Amino acid sequence: MITVSPILYAATPSAWHALAEAVGLVPAFPPDATWSEFVADGGLAVHGVAPDDPLSGTTDLHFLVDDLAATETSLVAAGFTAEHTPLDDVGDMLTVVIGSGARVTLTQPSSPPPAPTGPLAVLPIWYQPDLAEPRRLLEALGLRARLSADAGVWMDFVADGGGLVGLHRDEHVSFELSFEYSADLDALAERLTTAGYAAAVVDEAYNRTLRVATPDRSDLFVNGRQDDLYGYTRHDGAPA
């Protein structure tokens, strides 16, 4: 089993904790300024850093797996190399770096993550020019393709332990935190606005998206579930 659990580096972690809960994530334990974890369909970790830290405002693509050794075996069989790093209170961490320089990490938690629940799913987006190698890596990890754009610019994947990952063709390599919401997006926007956040639902070419201002003065995207499949193909990982 594998769970999508990106790591967000935040210079204002308490503000991010509040936003995470307002969007619909639930703290796994009382948040603190250094490290906090939240759960929904998938997970999110918030790592507090100094304002001048180059990592501030960035996101790492991280996964939780139930068998790290078996995961490494699958990666090696698919042609990837995993580097081991021992971490205090965590154990071994696997790091995979692909040809574009994009870096993915994996750890094995001491107890299984909660089962996916609720309408909010974690959906980190992986941007890079060529999507073939990221797709091969995600499939080696056991994620299943859900939707792909016929134009080849987008593909997303579902993890059996919770969460989604989107691949988006772009000239730059980066990861971005986002979410998918399968319930009433307008009602979520109203709740966020009532809580004091600048939030609005906009009509994109592919779907409706909620944009909410973050503590980093950027926008967090919460996508509505995509039901209009014109120009898209549904794959085996999509729910019936």
Regions found by a protein language model. Name each.
Residues M1-A18, T59-L61, T107-R136, A140-R144, ...:
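N-terminal beta-strand motif that seeds the catalytic metal site of vicinal oxygen chelate
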Residues T34, L68, D130-L131, V153:
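A generic "binding-loop/recognition-motif" signal
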Residues I2-T12, F38, A50-L120, I125, S148-D150, D156-G166, ...:
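Vicinal oxygen chelate
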Residues G24-T59, A102-S110, L143-F179, V212-L229:
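Conserved short beta-strand elements that form part of the metal-binding/catalytic scaffold
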Residues E21-A28, G79-T81, E139-R146, Y197:
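Conserved acetyl-CoA-binding loop of GNAT-fold acetyltransferases
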Residues A15-A22, L75, G101, P134-E139, ...:
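Conserved active-site tyrosine of GNAT-family acetyltransferases
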